[in-house]
Structures are given as C-alpha cells and as structure tokens.
C-alpha cells in the first residue's frame, strides 16, 4: 500500500513538473515572438520615415502617439506625419544598428537602438548617432507604435 501511494505521489509530481516546464517555455516563446515582431516594426517605422510613406506611418502610429525629439520638442501623431511630409525636409539618411528589445510582454515592447541620422527634419539638423527608444503596444489585437524618444550620443 505504501509503495502504491509513493508511486502515485511520484507520478503526480512528474506530471506537475512537466506542466510547469511547458508553461514556462510557452511564455519564453511568446516573449521571443513579441521581440521579433517589435524588431520588424522598428524597421517598418524607419523605412516609412526614410521613404516619406505617411500612409504606413498613419497605420503604424497609435492615435495617442508621442515622440520626444532632441532639444525636448514633443510631437504627436499628426505633427510627426506632417514633419515627414514637409517638402523642406532634406533627404534623411537613417541607419539603425544595435536594435535591442529591452522589455517584452504580451501587450508592450520597448526597444532601443543606435540610429545614425543625417539630414534636416522637423527643424532639427541631424548629423550623427542617436540613441532611440521606441515603445510598441498591442491595441485591439494589433501592434502599434505608441512613442519614441531620440537623444544624441555625445562624441567620445
């Protein structure tokens, strides 16, 4: 009887530990999927900015999107799109590097990258490396860009 009881307990523990392990691996896979999606959206964002693709920007940006530019200017979705359409805007060179997902959950992803920017945009003359933080959120089942911040990297 004791032996049967011991085998039942052992069996339950094995099943329970397997279930816990499966739950953890699925969470890790989900985080990796979010990270991949956010990294792809980062490239979509930069390509749309470079190509002045305002339709993609309007599709990507959440309605309450906000971006903080160097010098502290804050722009919303409408202002950001207007800056991209601006005929005074010089051809902007954008070269992202070191894209890292810093936080990923089922509904939020935070990325940083180092983007070399050259050109004029929104009255700011860019000529060098910028540290960028981008925030993506899942709204109604779809990933959207919620915000960003850009800070020049000081020459070392």
Regions of interest found by a model, annotated:
Residues 1-9:
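Bacterial N-terminal signal peptides that target proteins for export
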Residues 8-18:
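Bacterial N-terminal signal peptides
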Residues 1, 14, 22-23:
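Intrinsic disorder/low-complexity segments
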Residues 22-156:
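A beta-strand edge to alpha-helix "cap/lid" segment located at domain peripheries
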């Amino acid at each position: 009887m004791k032996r049967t009881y011991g085998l039942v307990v052992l069996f339950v523990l094995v099943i329970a530990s397997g279930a816990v392990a499966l739950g953890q691996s699925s969470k890790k896979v989900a985080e990796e999927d979010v990270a991949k999606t956010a990294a792809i959206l980062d490239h979509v964002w930069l390509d749309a900015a470079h190509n002045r693709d305002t339709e993609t920007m309007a599709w990507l940006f959440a309605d309450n999107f906000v971006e903080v530019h160097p010098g502290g200017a804050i722009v919303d979705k409408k202002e950001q799109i207007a800056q991209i359409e601006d005929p005074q805007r010089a051809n902007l060179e954008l070269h992202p590097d070191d894209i890292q997902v810093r936080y990923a959950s089922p509904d939020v992803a935070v990325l940083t990258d180092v983007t070399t920017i050259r050109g004029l945009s929104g009255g700011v003359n860019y000529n060098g490396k910028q540290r960028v933080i981008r925030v993506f959120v899942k709204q109604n089942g779809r990933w959207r860009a919620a915000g960003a911040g850009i800070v020049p990297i000081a020459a070392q």
